[in-house]
Amino acid sequence: MLEYSTITNKGDRSVNEDSIAVIPSGKSGFACILCDGLGGHGMGDVASGCVCDTFRNMLLGTTEMSGFLPVALRCAQANLMREQIRLNATTKMKTTAVALAVDDKKAYVAHIGDSRLYIFRKNKVMTRTLDHSVPQMLALCREIREDEIRNHPERSSVLLSLIHI
C-alpha cells in the first residue's frame, strides 16, 4: 500500500501556484507530479492545475509506466496551449513540472524547469535532476559553483517550462 503526504508553501506570493497529484497505478505502481506555476507571468496556478489534471486523467487506468511520462507531458503541453487560447492568455500560464512514475521494476523521471527530484540513500542526496535555469547552466559551464545556484541573482530565470519548449 502506498502511503504519502504532500505539502506546498506559497511563500510571499498572494496565490499558491503549486499543484500536486499522486495517483496509484496497478498493484504496486504509482505516479506523481509536482507543478510550480511561473510567478510574474500570471495564471501560474491555472497552468500548474491544468498540467496536474491532464497527468491525473491520463494515468487513470494505465498500468504501463514505461513511456508514460513523455506522452503525458506532451499531452499536458497541448492541453495547456488550448487553455491559453480559450482564456486569451497566450503569453501567460507557464509552469515547471517534475514527475515520477514507478512500477514493480523501475522508476521513471521527467522534468522541465527548476522543480527538482532528489534521490536519497541513507539520508544523503545521491543525485538530483538538473534545473533548466540560468544559474544551473552557469554551474555546468563552471562559471559558478553548484553551491552558488541557490543565491544567484538569476535563480528564478527558467530557460524551459511547459509552453516554453
Residues of each region from the PLM?
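PP2C/PPM-type serine/threonine phosphatase catalytic domain
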Residues: 1-163
